[in-house]
């Protein structure tokens, strides 16, 4: 802790800077330093169970976000013994909020739980993909999360964050904290590196924060380099925090 010069005599903390070294790559892969230097930010009354899931977007992109294709991916998850299905952007338009209760009942009848995608929104964010304007305002966010909880949704994937400025970093924690109040797990995408968040936030599941397989959809260059890039991730990305 560093004593502040402010009149309020508040104690502030500087962020950790860590270095992991070893004679081989083993300690780089196995390091726990990012988790060792943080403390849990809150406790939870919920029993969160991260697991495996199907995700249509990685194969069929936006065109797959419709009721019938998502039913197919629920059936696939059930056949594979997976716990979840993740429905990506545009579900509010292409499936509809009114049909989501029906869809979740079907998924649960197959033993599959549901994650839904959201834009982080905010004034910095001009993307078209929806739902938008549900996560960056505390009142709208809590209303939306109450609705999700009432339907039995188990988690959310929040995407397209605006850099690493303080306002955005606060938004991550506010989303996580409010989600915990409503029994929701959280995945971040298009986001900053996690820094010990698995220990800090009990409902945090994972973050993308890497130029990875999503880009195989967009460019042959990424396809040509996928095998090489995949061998780097354990040493340069997962050493900082889990995906």
Segments and roles (model prediction):
Residues 89-243:
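Aromatic- and carboxylate-enriched substrate-binding clefts and catalytic-loop regions
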């Amino acid at each position: 802790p560093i004593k502040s010069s402010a009149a309020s005599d508040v104690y502030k903390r500087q962020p950790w800077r860590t270095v992991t070294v070893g004679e081989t790559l083993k300690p780089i892969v196995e390091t726990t330093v990012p988790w060792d230097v943080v403390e849990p930010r809150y406790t939870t009354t919920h029993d969160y169970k991260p697991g495996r899931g199907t995700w249509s977007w990685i194969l069929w992109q936006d065109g797959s976000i419709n009721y019938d294709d998502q039913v197919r991916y629920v059936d696939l998850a059930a056949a594979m013994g997976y716990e979840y299905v993740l429905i990506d952007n545009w579900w509010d338009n292409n499936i509809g909020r009114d049909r989501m209760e029906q869809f979740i009942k079907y998924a649960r009848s197959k033993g599959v739980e549901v994650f839904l995608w959201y834009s982080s929104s905010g004034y910095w964010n001009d993307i078209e993909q929806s739902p938008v304007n549900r996560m960056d305002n505390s009142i709208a966010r809590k209303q939306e999360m109450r609705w999700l909880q009432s339907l039995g949704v188990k988690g959310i994937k929040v995407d397209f964050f605006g850099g690493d400025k303080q306002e955005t970093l606060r938004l991550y924690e506010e989303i996580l904290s409010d989600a915990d109040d409503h029994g929701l797990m959280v995945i971040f995408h298009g986001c900053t590196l996690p820094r010990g968040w698995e220990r800090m936030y009990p409902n945090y599941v994972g973050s993308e924060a890497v130029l990875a397989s999503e880009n195989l959809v967009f460019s042959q260059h990424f396809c040509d380099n996928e095998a090489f890039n995949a061998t780097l991730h354990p040493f340069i990305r997962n050493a900082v925090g889990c995906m």
